[in-house]
From Swiss-Prot:
This is Ubiquitin carboxyl-terminal hydrolase calypso. The record marks 228 as: Important for enzyme activity. GO terms for biological process: epigenetic regulation of gene expression; heterochromatin formation; protein deubiquitination; specification of segmental identity, abdomen; ubiquitin-dependent protein catabolic process. The record marks 125 as: Transition state stabilizer. It catalyses: Thiol-dependent hydrolysis of ester, thioester, amide, peptide and isopeptide bonds formed by the C-terminal Gly of ubiquitin (a 76-residue protein attached to proteins as an intracellular targeting signal). Residues 405-471 are annotated as: Positively charged C-terminal tail required for binding nucleosomes. PROSITE patterns: UCH_DOMAIN, ULD. Its main location: nucleus. PANTHER family: UBIQUITIN CARBOXYL-TERMINAL HYDROLASE (PTHR10589), UBIQUITIN CARBOXYL-TERMINAL HYDROLASE BAP1 (PTHR10589:SF28). Keywords: Chromatin regulator, Hydrolase, Nucleus, Protease, Thiol protease, Ubl conjugation pathway. Its EC number is 3.4.19.12. Catalytic component of the polycomb repressive deubiquitinase (PR-DUB) complex, at least composed of caly/calypso, Asx and sba (MBD5/6 homolog). The PR-DUB complex associates with nucleosomes to mediate deubiquitination of histone H2AK118ub1 substrates; the association requires the positively charged C-terminal tail of caly, probably due to direct binding of DNA. Interacts (via ULD domain) with Asx (via DEUBAD domain); the interaction produces a stable heterodimer with a composite binding site for ubiquitin. Residues 45-276 form the UCH catalytic domain.
Amino acid sequence: MNAAGGGSGAQAAGVAAGNSSLSHNALLSTASGATTMPMAQLADGWLELESDPGLFTLLLKDFGCHDVQVEEVYDLQKPIESPYGFIFLFRWIEERRARRKIVETTAEIFVKDEEAISSIFFAQQVVPNSCATHALLSVLLNCNENNLQLGDTLSRLKTHTKGMSPENKGLAIGNTPELACAHNSHAMPQARRRLERTGAGVSSCRFTGEAFHFVSFVPINGQLFELDGLKPYPMNHGGWEDSEDWTDKFRRVMAERLGIATGEQDIRFNLMAVVPDRRIAITHKLKMLRTNQAIVSGTLQKLLKADEQGESGNGDSQRPDTPTTLLEPSAFTARDLQSLLKNLDTEIAINEQHLADENDRRHMFKVDASRRTHNYDKFICTFLSMLAHQGVLGELVSQHLLPSKKVSGQGAANRISKQSNTASAGGSTTGASASTPKTQQQQAATAKNGKSPSKTPGRRRKGRNKCRKRK
C-alpha cells in the first residue's frame, strides 16, 4: 500500500476494517519512504502491550528516539521537570454511566476545522491493539523538533504524513514495518494467543478480561490538546495563564476527569509522563561540577603556594597570577576554597550515584523485557513430561491440587476425632482415680491377712440373704 495514498488497495481496506492479519507475501510501501519489503513479521497483526513505563522507554528507543524516557506519575501535585506530554490509561467500557458523562463533556471541545486538524499530528486508530504506539507518537510528533531528536523513522513518518487526514495517518502508522516490528517485539506470548482466540477488537492493555485504552495530552501552540485515536476529532481544552505552566492546566483537567470517572468508586487507571532522558541532564551537571572542581582545586593550590612563599620570608615576592574568570584569590581564603571544594566533591558523588541508579533502571528494563517476552511454554511442558516419566507427577498433583472443600472437610473430621479421643481419655482417667481408694483398701487387707479379701456380694445375693433372715 502506498502510505501517501491513504488506504488505496485491498490491504488498506482490510486494515481499516479491523483485520488483525496480513498476507505472508504482502509487499507494502512504508511511510518512511523505504523500498517495498516482505512483511512476514506483520503476518499476525499488532499485539497488545502492557502499560509499563520501562516497556514504553525501550519501545521509544526501538523507534529511534534515544533521548526520551517514560515515567509513571503517582502524584499529580508533584512537579515534573520538562515533560513533553502525558499518557493516560483508563478502562474502556462504553456503556458505563461515567463514560457517557465524559463523552458529553468532551464533545463540546472537539476541533472540527480541517485546517487546524491537518496542522497537528492526530491519527485515528484504525489498526486494533496499536493504541500504545499511537499514544507515544501523538506526544513525540507534536513536539518541537529543536527540543527533541526523533530519529530517522519518526522524522520521515512525520514528513510524509503531513497534511493527511486522521484516518490515513492511522493507516500509515499501521503499515510502517519499523513501528509494527518494534511494537510486537515487546508483547507477551499471551498476547498472541489472546489475539488468535478472541480476534481483533478494542485494545486491552492488561490481560484481565476488560478493555483499557491510552490517550495523550500534549501542549500545542499554547493550547492543551487531548488526542484519542478512538475519537473522530482532537479535543482542545484551552490555554493557560501566563504565570503558570501548561502542566498546571493539565492537572485541573485531570482532576475534573478523574472526578467524573471515579463517581462509581472506579479508580482503575494510571498516568505516565514522557520526559527527557534523565541521564542527559545528570551527565551535563556532572560535567559542570567537575569543571568547577578543577578550577577551585587549581586556585586553591596557587593560593597555598603563594602563602608558603610569603611565610618563607621573601617579602618582595608577588603572588602568581590566578584566573579571574571565576574565582579571585583575594575574595576567598584557603579555608573558603577548601569548604567549596568539599561541597563540590559531595555534589559530584551524589550525581554519580543518581547516574548509576538511572543506568541500573535501564538495565532492569531490559531484564524485565526479556522475562516478559520469553515463551516459557516449552520449558513447562518439558518439565511436566519429565515428572510424568519419573512417575512423580500424579503424586504431586494429588498433594497440591486437592479441592479446597475436600481438604476443609477432612480437617473438620480430624478435629472431631481428636475431640472424641480427648473426651474418652478424660473419662477413663476419672474412673481410674475414683477407684483408687477401694483398691488401696483391698491391698491393705491382703497385706494383713495374707490373702485377697472376698468380693462384696452383689445386689442379687444381698436380696437372698434378706429373705433368709425373714424366714
